[in-house]
């Protein structure tokens, strides 16, 4: 049976980088037929039409149709998978509260449209930043959709962390397992080497603590800014790749721990209801579970408190703005 995949901000750089990979079967598998729905703001609809033309011109066997709209109700109607990529970027002189409010005007109505029109088995990935709190807004405005269906992307942070560690140790990325990121998708995030393994060895035992704390953690957290500085534009292909990884493993399963920002049920002391990145096991079928009993020592706890504190501040700000109850 065909699946409907809705992509917002479809005419943007990440949208352009991801749509062809979805249509080729890299996200939902090589046998899954699909229909794409592209949601864009009115001024970008013509660009989205051009992308749709190219998608058709690729003659992907799995792609049944491409629909383009500026109406969230149409875009999310019958959607099985929603990739919320479109977001308001921070502009010069903008305070964080302004950014949260601007994005609230996007993610509040999208949450409602998902609630009212998406398929019963919908799964949602928020990519647009600030991703954790945008996810919180959408989730809180979709009260009829189980909150386990909503997630925000921290897989790009994980992929960056894995690659940097592999380069440091001179190993392949496939030798690094269970390396996850906790907390917010921001420079406060905490990449966890205590529970990660490299060729079966504890990752934290293979590096100097000084390097871990003062070089590795800050560089993972600020990698996005480093890329903007180098190429004059934000990460697009790597963000698209991480979104593919996230949804593929969520739907089809994975044999390693991975990072997903999901609603907390109080695990590891993270306040109930906050959308925080956690380590997750992914059995497939759009399910996830947060494992118990992972090592969270004093160092990790101190880092967690900082990033969770930031998430609480963002939550309180959007609550004050009336974007969540």
UniProtKB/Swiss-Prot annotation:
Keywords: NAD, Oxidoreductase, Tricarboxylic acid cycle. PROSITE patterns: MDH (PS00068). Its EC number is 1.1.1.37. GO terms for biological process: malate metabolic process; tricarboxylic acid cycle. NCBIfam families: MalateDH-SF1 (TIGR01759), PRK05442.1 (NF003916). Belongs to the LDH/MDH superfamily. MDH type 2 family. This is Malate dehydrogenase. It comes from Rubrobacter xylanophilus (strain DSM 9941 / JCM 11954 / NBRC 16129 / PRD-1).
């Amino acid at each position: 049976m065909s699946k409907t995949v809705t992509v917002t901000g479809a005419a943007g750089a990440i949208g352009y980088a991801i749509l062809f990979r979805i249509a080729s079967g890299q996200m939902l598998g090589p046998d899954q037929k699909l229909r794409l729905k592209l949601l864009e703001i009115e001024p970008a609809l013509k660009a989205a039409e051009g992308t749709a033309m190219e998608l058709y011109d690729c003659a992907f066997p799995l792609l049944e149709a491409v629909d383009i709209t500026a109406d969230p109700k149409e875009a999310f109607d019958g959607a099985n998978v929603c990739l919320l990529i479109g977001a308001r970027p921070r502009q010069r002189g903008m305070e964080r509260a302004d950014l949260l409010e601007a994005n609230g005007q996007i993610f509040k109505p999208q949450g409602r449209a998902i609630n009212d029109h998406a398929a019963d088995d919908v799964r949602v990935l928020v990519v647009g930043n600030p991703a954790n709190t945008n996810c919180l807004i959408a989730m809180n405005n979709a009260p009829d959709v189980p909150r386990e269906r909503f997630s925000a992307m921290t897989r790009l942070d994980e992929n960056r962390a894995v690659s940097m560690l592999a380069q440091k140790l001179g190993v392949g990325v496939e030798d690094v397992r269970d390396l996850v990121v906790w907390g917010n998708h921001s420079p406060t995030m905490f990449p966890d080497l205590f529970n990660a393994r490299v060729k079966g060895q504890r990752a934290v035992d293979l590096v100097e603590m000084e390097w871990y704390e003062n070089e590795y953690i800050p560089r993972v957290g600020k990698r996005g800014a480093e890329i903007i500085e180098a190429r004059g534009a934000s990460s697009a292909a790597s963000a698209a790749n991480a979104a593919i990884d996230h949804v593929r493993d969520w739907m089809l399963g994975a044999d390693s721990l991975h990072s997903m920002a999901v609603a907390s049920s109080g695990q590891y002391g993270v306040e109930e209801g906050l959308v925080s990145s956690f380590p997750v096991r992914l059995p497939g079928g759009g399910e996830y579970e947060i494992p118990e009993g992972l090592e969270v020592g004093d160092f990790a706890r101190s880092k967690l408190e900082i990033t969770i504190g930031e998430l609480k501040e963002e939550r309180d700000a959007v609550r004050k703005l009336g974007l969540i109850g």
